[in-house]
């Protein structure tokens, strides 16, 4: 099994706090082998999947391979710029929120953001790019702005390459982004209500500042 996330940030698998989701993940126990990024998190994955730790191998995370391939990274950047020339020569802020277990419909993501204010507060050379989690299906931004966009035609990892700053919350995207040695900020407006649980000492272990309000 190749897991979609690198590292161990928020709790997942059968250790997720939403029991209906945890029940859906009972198939994890069928894995014969799981690959993870390092020895330090083998026990975490074994616990999350309810499998023997000997089935968890620290062989690396394949999705990070692209971040060590300069040619591939350059080609990806050029593809993004070809499709979105407005990103070139701009300070690109990528917002990559994770999905919420709270509520009946995880596909509807409504961040606590005043987009009118955000658009006014951005500097002339800045653009705010929202990269939704694949489970998020709603429009997110109802109005049209020349400095705020929602991107679905490229992956979050693709957008990382053309970004200057990552803004996230509880997403394991931080592990990939750390390889680029670019700044990370955490916008956690629902921290008090977010009860998924963490493997990290939150927020002390985070590689960036945490903000709970847009101000």
List each language-model region with its residue ranges:
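Short, well-ordered beta-strand core segments
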Residues: 1, 34, 166-167, 184
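Active-site and donor-binding regions of nucleotide-sugar-utilizing enzymes
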Residues: 1-71
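Short, solvent-exposed loop/turn segments at secondary-structure junctions
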Residues: 5-8, 39-42, 62-65, 98-102, ...
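Short active-site oxyanion
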Residues: 29-34, 127-128, 162-165, 208-212
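Conserved catalytic-core segment of nucleotide-activated headgroup transferases in glycan assembly
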Residues: 62-142
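Donor nucleotide-activated moiety binding/catalytic core segment of transferases
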Residues: 134-175, 180
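Catalytic binding pocket for nucleotide-activated donors in carbohydrate/polymer assembly enzymes
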Residues: 143, 172-215
């Amino acid at each position: 099994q190749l897991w979609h996330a690198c590292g161990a940030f928020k709790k997942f698998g059968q250790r997720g706090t939403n029991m209906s989701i945890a029940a859906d993940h009972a198939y994890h126990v069928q894995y014969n082998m799981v690959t993870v990024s390092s020895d330090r998190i083998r026990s975490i994955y074994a616990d999350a999947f309810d499998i023997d730790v000997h089935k968890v191998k620290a062989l690396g995370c394949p999705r990070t391979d692209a971040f060590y391939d300069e040619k591939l990274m350059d080609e990806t950047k050029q593809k993004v710029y070809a499709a979105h020339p407005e990103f070139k020569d701009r300070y690109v802020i990528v917002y990559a929120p994770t999905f919420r277990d709270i509520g009946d419909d995880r596909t509807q993501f409504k961040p606590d953001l005043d987009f009118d204010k955000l658009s006014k507060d951005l500097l002339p050379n800045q653009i705010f790019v929202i990269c939704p989690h694949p489970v998020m299906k709603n429009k997110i931004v109802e109005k049209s702005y020349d400095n705020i966009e929602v991107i679905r035609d490229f992956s979050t990892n693709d957008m990382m390459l053309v970004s200057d700053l990552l803004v996230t919350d509880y997403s394991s995207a931080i592990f990939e982004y750390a390889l680029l040695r670019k700044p990370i900020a955490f916008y956690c407006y629902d921290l008090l209500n977010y009860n998924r649980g963490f493997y990290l000492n939150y927020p002390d272990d985070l590689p960036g500042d945490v903000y709970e309000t847009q101000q």
